[in-house]
From Swiss-Prot:
It comes from Drosophila melanogaster (Fruit fly). Residues 51-68 have a biased composition (Pro residues). Pfam families: Homeodomain (PF00046). Changing H131Q: In strain: Berkeley and Oregon-R. It comes from the Eukaryota. InterPro entries: EMX-VAX-Noto_Homeobox_TFs, HD, Homeobox_CS, Homeodomain-like_sf. This is Homeotic protein empty spiracles.
Length: 497
């Protein structure tokens, strides 16, 4: 005889219970909870066919959870009545001695949940065949041998952990449910029905086996249903701890990872500029670290700053993007000088994402041209035109007719201003700025040609070469005044001569 061990429900008890067939019929007494005599067990309507067993047999593991009759008193250490074996000799309930023996079978060290679904199905068919032949009395030794054989096969087949599905609960949740459930006294089934209204209303519901095998657990078992949300009683919702869903990094104030947003770099790379008195304070310098003021504004941002503590994060990111697109009109002198020098060799360890700054240098090549320069506060970025504005300049292509009319206007008057310049621009389909810049370049070229003629004479090729070099200087001077217009039109004149 196996040693009696008090039943300790495990997580496998909620996983491995089979659901061989979905039974539809249930008795009104099991719903209402009225007193039912032990001889009146045949009141359940038989809706599952002629081969369906009586109600005493229907409550095997795998049937929908039903409430035992009120006259049956539950023993504190015993499983519910629908975990017991079918009754002998066609009686609705077995003999008390047979109950004790069957409890010993169920309280073996390896209970039913450790069997595979196929082995449990074999045991279920064996019990059904014995019940269909009431003339042959059932031998408990045969049942015990069958159980031992199945346990041995299950132990030899798989020494692994019990089957875990995607919807299976964590191992801590059944433990908590057991500790809260076992302290309750064995209340009558009517009180259990009042406490668990959800299971009383929906007893015949059995989800598919592939989704939630533990849904066939009985209503009075300590491990409750977990995978089916609509059959969960309110008491179980109070017992279950909140599920540990993966939370994003922005929900943890002390999290190590910065907040990632779709159209923005990480939070460690974005920091508003200290433009006004209401801006964030500058971080203090630490001994042994390089000077923070020497780094670009998106490198020296402290990565441990939580994003939710900075209410101006999104506005600062938009401001920095706009400042970068305006080619440095808003950058301060120290930040511009630091960005000009590029990344120092020791700056990679202070950057949360080193690849982001490299991509930003590719996006904004004007940062690379400000190498080692110091600029005063009051001058905008357009003061720095000569080093980096040349490659981006779009050259205005004048037509021969426009050049001819401009030359005639220059011969008559070298200074075209006011209404005359406006009329000439409208006549040539040009802007006033283009006309003004062309006249400035033409006057500069005329002066240089006069100076070279007075010096007595060098070749025309050398003169054109000097004029080209002088035009570059004039272009730089004029382009600082007229930023919106290109000023290389004089090269067209040199090509036309």
């Amino acid at each position: 005889m196996t040693k009696m061990i008090p039943p300790v429900p495990t997580a496998a008890a909620a996983v491995m219970m089979p659901t061989p067939k979905q039974k539809i019929g249930f008795s009104i007494e099991s719903i209402v909870g009225n007193d039912v005599s032990t001889a009146g067990g045949n009141s359940t309507p038989d809706l599952s066919g002629p081969q369906s067993p009586p109600p005493g047999e229907r409550n095997v593991p795998g049937s929908p959870p039903q409430t035992p009759p009120a006259t049956l008193t539950l023993i504190p250490g015993s499983p519910p009545h629908h975990l017991m074996a079918p009754p002998a000799h066609g009686l609705p309930y077995p003999h008390p001695h047979a109950q004790q023996q069957q409890q010993q079978h169920l309280q073996a060290p390896h209970p039913h949940p450790h069997l595979s679904p196929a082995q449990q199905h074999v045991l279920h068919q064996h019990l059904l065949m014995q019940h269909q032949h009431p003339g042959t009395p059932k031998s408990h030794q045969d049942i015990q041998e069958l159980l031992q054989r199945l346990h041995h096969n299950a132990a030899m087949a798989s020494g692994l952990s019990p089957l875990q599905t995607r919807l299976s609960p964590e191992t801590e949740q059944p433990q908590m449910a057991v500790s809260l459930k076992r302290e309750r006294s064995p209340a009558p089934p009517a009180m259990e029905q009042a406490e668990n209204p959800a299971q009383r209303i929906q007893p015949p519901h059995t989800p598919p086996k592939s989704v939630s095998p533990q849904s066939s657990q009985p209503s009075s078992s300590p491990t409750l249903l977990i995978s089916s949300p609509h059959a969960t009683p309110p008491q179980q919702q109070q017992q279950q701890p909140p599920p540990n869903y993966p939370k994003p990094a922005m929900m943890h104030p002390g999290g190590a990872g910065p907040m990632m947003m779709p159209g923005m770099p990480p939070a460690g790379l974005v920091r508003p500029f200290p433009m006004g008195p209401g801006g964030p304070p500058m971080p203090q310098g630490q001994p042994g670290l390089p000077d923070i003021k020497a780094l670009p504004p998106y490198i020296n941002a402290p990565p441990e700053l939580p994003p939710q503590h900075n209410p101006h994060l999104i506005a600062a990111a938009q401001f920095q993007m706009a400042a970068a697109l305006q080619a440095g009109h808003v950058l301060g002198p120290a930040a511009a000088a630091a960005a000009a020098a590029g990344l120092p060799p020791h700056a990679a360890q202070f950057m949360p994402n080193p690849g982001m700054a490299r991509d930003s240098y590719q996006l904004y090549p004007w940062l690379l041209s400000r190498h080692g320069r110091i600029f005063p506060h009051r001058f905008p970025g357009s003061f720095l035109v000569p080093p980096f504005r040349k490659p981006k300049r779009i050259r205005t292509a004048f037509s021969p007719s426009q050049l001819l009319k401009l030359e005639h206007a220059f011969e008559s008057n070298q200074y075209v201003v006011g209404a005359e310049r406006k009329a000439l621009a409208q006549n040539l389909n040009l802007s006033e700025t283009q006309v003004k810049v062309w006249f400035q370049n033409r006057r500069t070229k005329h002066k240089r040609m006069q100076q070279e003629d007075e010096k007595g004479g060098e070749g025309g090729s050398q003169r054109n070469m000097h004029n080209g070099s002088g035009d570059e200087d004039d272009d730089e001077l004029i382009d600082m005044e007229m930023d919106e217009c290109p000023s290389d039109e004089e090269h067209e004149l040199d090509a036309s001569h």
